């Protein structure tokens, strides 16, 4: 019997997840299908119960449901609970179990371009929203010891740091102070929507004085190279856009559902083609 998987969100027509997962199923000769479900906020509970009744094997959760979905699940993974958001649900033994692969996917993506372990790196996170929270907790869970958070509202950065129970040395900074201190970091991670199409001329931090070998990663992938990445490249930095994070979080969900590891490079090239790269 064909296994059913999917993604719920609103809007959902733009999602690249069906193309990526269905290609992986076909490549691995698996009898499965991944479908995008448009689910409005007011019917989220009914939709989740319906998917469970249909026997869906697993599904992803995207905007605006990542927090609200938690009220309709049977179990939530401790890391997802700490992050406060779920983006992947596994249907196992009659239970819907929620996970967050966004942060772990980002960590795996970052490790893929770092020639050294992340644990000893000094990291700066730009932004203190949901994406930053997932990445912060996942980096801490991976053993990173030094993560500073810069945000337009410093109090929000302080709240994010205070919520983490892991042993991490962290300082909350203004974006102005982070700009001045950028040369002291090994990795800078841009987690806000600043620089996303159509406001491509904007950047949360002017790159001007990076040390040699710095990695600058931006979770945005439209455009492929945001202003911060262009500036970092001019400084000789190793740069990474959001495609890697998207692919790795999807691959991790795929692995959780099926027990099979998909071909990451195949997934990545497919997504790049679909985005017109």
Curated annotation (Swiss-Prot):
This is Shikimate dehydrogenase (NADP(+)). Its EC number is 1.1.1.25. It comes from the Bacteria. Pathway: Metabolic intermediate biosynthesis; chorismate biosynthesis; chorismate from D-erythrose 4-phosphate and phosphoenolpyruvate: step 4/7. The keyword Amino-acid biosynthesis applies. Belongs to the shikimate dehydrogenase family. PANTHER family: BIFUNCTIONAL 3-DEHYDROQUINATE DEHYDRATASE_SHIKIMATE DEHYDROGENASE, CHLOROPLASTIC, SHIKIMATE DEHYDROGENASE. The gene is aroE. GO terms for biological process: amino acid biosynthetic process; aromatic amino acid family biosynthetic process; chorismate biosynthetic process; shikimate metabolic process. GO terms for cellular component: cytosol. The lineage of its organism: Bacteria, Bacillati, Bacillota, Bacilli, Bacillales. InterPro entries: Aminoacid_DH-like_N_sf, NAD(P)-bd_dom_sf, SDH_C, Shikimate_DH, Shikimate_DH-bd_N, Shikimate_DH_fam, Shikm_DH/Glu-tRNA_Rdtase. Keywords: Amino-acid biosynthesis, Aromatic amino acid biosynthesis, NADP, Oxidoreductase. HAMAP family: Shikimate_DH_AroE.
